[in-house]
Amino acid sequence: MTRFAPGAPAWFDLGSPDVAASADFYTGLFGWTATVVSDPGAGGYTTFSSDGKLVAAVARHQIDTPYHRPYGPGNDQHGMPAIWTVYFATDDADALTKRVETAGGEVIMTPMDVLGLGRMAVFADPAGAAFAVWRKGVMEGAEVTGVPGSVGWVELVTDGIGAARDFYPATLGLAPADTGLKGVTDPVWHIGDTPVAGTQELGVTGAVRPHWAVLFAVHDCDATVRRAVELGGSVENEPADTPRGRRADLLDPHGAGFSVVELREGYPAAAGGAS
């Protein structure tokens, strides 16, 4: 069975100005194992594994656009921004590129093959939130999600939710649906009956531009926050109880935003949307 249905968040990587330093931070924070891809053409691309299963990666960031600086121009010390990118599964990156253009998005990187592992492209939605798509080859995507030590959830952080309600169904096939929670009006994105992503109003964290945010599942939110600070990270929002679970919003030492969350039992977590 295919793990990731088209439109589901399938892969997650960090663009960083200093791959080695970023690898040290995240392995120290989450207990991941970092492995540098041996192919010379990979440019030092480094994968992260949790208990032997791929969860994410880090690469040297070589794209610098306003879309890749959601926390503003001063969120790095090395001349290039740091940002987590969410890759959504697709059966056809080229056809999806045409849909993005038709729906009012922007093509940041046209489709390209990646070492036989798959085919990718990078876009921005009409509000300016950057995201990528992944057509699987040898690599399908993350081997585990939704459990501590892996990506637990992703969210569209935006001030353009009206446009998003039109754009993402037309491109990724994501259907917006109400959460059913009192006082929460931002939609959850579904593939069929499966929730695969959420939405957050821009301004809740220090971000100044729309973006796709990555939430990592952890056993202990407060302890993880303390460890992040010890390793050189900083806190955007202190741990607090939310409908999804206890959560905090952080910046890594190079300014990449991410969140950590103790997933509440029975609440939707990251999933492939496969059937």
Curated annotation (Swiss-Prot):
Involved in the biosynthesis of the anthracyclines carminomycin and daunorubicin (daunomycin) which are aromatic polyketide antibiotics that exhibit high cytotoxicity and are widely applied in the chemotherapy of a variety of cancers. In vivo, it acts jointly with DoxA in the conversion of 13-deoxycarminomycin and 13-deoxydaunorubicin to yield carminomycin and daunorubicin, respectively. Pfam families: Glyoxalase (PF00903). This is Anthracycline biosynthesis protein DnrV. Pathway: Antibiotic biosynthesis; daunorubicin biosynthesis; Antibiotic biosynthesis; carminomycin biosynthesis. PROSITE patterns: VOC. GO terms for biological process: daunorubicin biosynthetic process. InterPro entries: Anthracycline_SecMetBiosynth, Glyas_Bleomycin-R_OHBP_Dase, Glyas_Fos-R_dOase_dom, VOC. Keywords: Antibiotic biosynthesis, Repeat. Residues 8-136, 150-263 form the VOC domain. Disulfide bonds: none annotated. The keyword Repeat applies. It comes from Streptomyces peucetius.
